[in-house]
């Protein structure tokens, strides 16, 4: 476990609690939406006339929204349980700006433009799995290649809202470990 300045266990525990609060707000909002849509569907069913094509269309649209929000709730609950498993610290060579991204199974954000956690399938996340520390690049479809200097790759073990452990690595991620984590969540 690392104890470098500014990235202590205490710092990481504070970050985890902050991220869990954001994830919980998303879960709560989705639960409210699911409840409201369930009530709307119930009310529509009570007043539903099978011969009214417009009512059928409204009901099908509400049902599709309900299914989407319910699926989003399940994703939010999963993200709440284990918000992230990795972190990358890097310097964008073009912008000359230091960045830190936490990586999880899905995005966690109050503001989508500045997520607390990025999705593991995001192009920038590929350097967590595929690159060693130092000068590396990643590609974004339709945008091209970005050059960065990767300075840290950190892996986390989070269980029951608690940071169990974390460690820094300078090697390419073990695909078996990643597969195990993603299968568990």
Walk through the language-model features, giving the residues of each:
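Extended, charged low-complexity regulatory segments
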Residues: 1-184
